[in-house]
């Protein structure tokens, strides 16, 4: 189904002039971000005009809008989600920090009963984390052990438990001393004074090698793994409430999944949302006026700059346009040649031309659009400020034209070809 566009009404009047000025300003800003070659000093975009020739549109499909069109704006949504996460994060840390300041031998410590020997049933590390399940693992990252490739699976637990349990109360020391967990947590080697030191500010010294941490009577006993990690502070200092290392609070576990705010928030689909896919062919007189300054290197580098005026007087275009209506938004973009062929198939006229006039030496599946892009042709005129005998005296004019046209193509491809798109509020 073909439709006719009232081009004059759509591109004239105050709204048409405002849209043309926005397009001119947009292209001008893009040129200011381009790295210019040595022989060009600046590129300025002065005017843009839609011309008088309308495009030829042929509707190919009505369908549901692409999922990318339902993504919320990152600037607005990310800030809201970040504030929620920061608030929840702060409340959880405040609660955990206050709980950890309590003595480790208080009666209110929540533990899963009954406690089991971690070496039963194939030594699964998950039951060992039961005394610390109320803690967020974000604040207690797992750490590898130097000298052991890949680390060990239970090091993180032993490091965490040192801040809240002392001496043989730690699972490692209890197992090494032959005390089963089912009989309770014993503390026959340390008195109440030592227990107090384990949860106070002096708990930071547990990262150092201390003879008290080793049970010399048992050959299977070993030093606390925290003493072997001087360059990576353990979680025991955080558990004890020691604030001398605030930077440790921001360490992340590499195994942790990404935070939710990194995923885009999607708008809700509605039955009235729709999308139109149409083939757009254009061979019109759209105009774009640019100026550039060419640098002359004689008799010295960048000796003088001469103005060069470039006028784009027409464009030949062939591609598939996508217009999606979602609530009060209209999203507009073009599809690349590969995406267009996959979604709506190749153009019938192009297929007939390919069958009637096969191109020797070329891949029969390669279309002209893939070779030249969506902009098939750009007509340009150049005006030089100085001429001699009707001939241009500047040698870099052709280079400047090719550079400017290449940038026009690049801006079009990057800004208007899906997944890039423009959104209009209506």
Swiss-Prot record:
Pfam families referenced in this protein's UniProt entry, alphabetically? MMM1
The question of whether Endoplasmic reticulum is a record keyword is answered with yes
InterPro entries per record: Mdm12 (IPR027532), MMM1_dom (IPR019411), SMP_LBD (IPR031468)
**Residues covered by the SMP-LTD domain:** 1-426
The Gene Ontology CC terms held by the record are: endoplasmic reticulum membrane; ERMES complex
| Biased composition range(s): Basic and acidic residues | 96-109, 244-264, 349-360
Establish whether keyword Cell membrane is in the entry: no
Q: How does it assemble?
A: Component of the ER-mitochondria encounter structure (ERMES) or MDM complex, composed of mmm1, mdm10, mdm12 and mdm34. A mmm1 homodimer associates with one molecule of mdm12 on each side in a pairwise head-to-tail manner, and the SMP-LTD domains of mmm1 and mdm12 generate a continuous hydrophobic tunnel for phospholipid trafficking.
Question: By what name is this protein known?
Answer: Mitochondrial distribution and morphology protein 12
The gene from which this protein is expressed is: mdm12
């Amino acid at each position: 189904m073909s439709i006719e566009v009232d081009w004059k009404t759509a591109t004239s009047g105050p709204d048409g002039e405002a849209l043309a000025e926005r397009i001119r300003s947009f292209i001008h800003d893009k040129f200011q971000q381009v790295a210019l070659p040595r022989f060009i000093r600046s590129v300025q975009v002065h005017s843009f005009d839609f011309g008088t020739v309308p495009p030829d549109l042929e509707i190919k499909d009505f369908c549901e809008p692409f999922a990318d069109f339902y993504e919320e704006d990152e600037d607005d949504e990310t800030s809201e989600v970040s504030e929620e996460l920061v608030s929840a994060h702060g409340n959880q840390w405040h609660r955990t920090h206050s709980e950890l300041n309590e003595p480790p031998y208080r009666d209110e410590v929540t533990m899963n009963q009954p406690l089991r020997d971690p070496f039963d049933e194939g030594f699964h590390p998950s039951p060992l984390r039961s005394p610390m399940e109320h803690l967020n693992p974000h604040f207690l990252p797992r750490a590898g052990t130097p000298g052991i490739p890949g680390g060990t699976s239970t090091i993180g637990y032993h490091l965490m438990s040192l801040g809240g349990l002392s001496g043989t109360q730690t699972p490692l020391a209890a197992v090494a001393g032959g005390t089963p967990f089912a009989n309770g947590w014993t503390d026959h080697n340390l008195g109440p004074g030592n227990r107090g030191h384990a949860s106070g500010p002096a708990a930071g010294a547990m990262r150092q090698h201390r003879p008290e941490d080793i049970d010399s009577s048992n050959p299977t006993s070993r030093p606390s793994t925290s003493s072997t990690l001087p360059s990576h502070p353990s979680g025991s200092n955080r558990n004890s409430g020691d604030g001398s290392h605030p930077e440790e609070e921001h360490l992340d576990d590499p195994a942790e999944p990404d935070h939710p705010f990194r995923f885009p928030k999607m708008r809700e689909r509605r039955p009235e949302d729709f999308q139109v896919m149409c083939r757009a062919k254009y061979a019109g007189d759209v105009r774009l006026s640019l100026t550039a300054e060419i640098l002359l290197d004689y008799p010295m580098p960048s000796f003088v700059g001469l103005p060069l005026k470039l006028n784009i007087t027409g464009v030949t275009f062939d591609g598939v346009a996508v217009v999606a209506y979602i609530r009060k938004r209209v999203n507009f973009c073009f599809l690349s040649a590969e995406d267009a062929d996959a979604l709506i198939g190749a153009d019938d006229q192009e297929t007939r031309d390919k069958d009637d006039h096969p191109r020797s030496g070329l891949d029969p599946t390669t279309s002209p659009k893939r070779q030249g892009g969506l902009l098939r042709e750009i007509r340009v005129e150049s005006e030089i400020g100085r001429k001699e005998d009707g001939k241009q005296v500047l040698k870099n004019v052709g280079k400047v034209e090719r550079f400017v046209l290449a940038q026009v193509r690049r801006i079009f491809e990057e800004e208007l070809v899906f997944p890039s798109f423009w959104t209009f509020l209506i």
